[in-house]
């Protein structure tokens, strides 16, 4: 199976900072999937690293330049995961999809970050999945699925086990995005998922759920065309 993962930067690099064990556990999960015969691509978010830099930069500059800072943060996080993957990855963070596909064709795990200003890594992962005709897109984030509202600030939020892409558009359509902002699935990614008719799974961004998302035994939300 050809699988693209959107790995939230905040799960790889939590607020307390880098953890060798944490990064190694993610690397082990992706290596295991490769050993099982899957073709694995990982798009890593900027997370807290990006938000810290952007919060300072925003005092001096515009959103477009803040986007560029965020992109660099995603690539730094990507390099950490690449280093943990060792020989299963290439020590290069591609900046476009053609270079990304070359790495996949070398039978390596692809790891990349952001590509364009105003595009979140969710949107990048969805576009990559469309570009390479992936079988599955997995969004591994700090929430365990798609809810009717943000569960982090709404006690009455209801988790949705299965929805279609049109319903996803309705849920995410009112969201606004700026450099460094985070959400379970951002509006642009939702539009790409719908356009490409991508089967998508949203799970809690832990190694166990990453593995389970491919086997189908996960606890997240399945999004179908």
Curated annotation (Swiss-Prot):
Its EC number is 2.7.4.22. Keywords: ATP-binding, Cytoplasm, Kinase, Nucleotide-binding, Pyrimidine biosynthesis, Transferase. Pathway: Pyrimidine metabolism; CTP biosynthesis via de novo pathway; UDP from UMP (UMPK route): step 1/1. GO terms for cellular component: cytoplasm. Its main location: cytoplasm. The keyword Cytoplasm applies. It is an enzyme of class 2 (transferase). Gene3D superfamilies: Acetylglutamate kinase-like. ATP binds at residues 9-10, 47, 51, 141-142, 147, 150. UMP binds at residues 46, 67, 115-121. It catalyses: UMP + ATP = UDP + ADP. GO terms for molecular function: ATP binding; UMP kinase activity. The keyword Kinase applies. Belongs to the UMP kinase family. Homohexamer. PANTHER family: URIDYLATE KINASE, URIDYLATE KINASE PUMPKIN, CHLOROPLASTIC. Catalyzes the reversible phosphorylation of UMP to UDP. This is Uridylate kinase. It comes from Methanococcus maripaludis (strain C5 / ATCC BAA-1333).
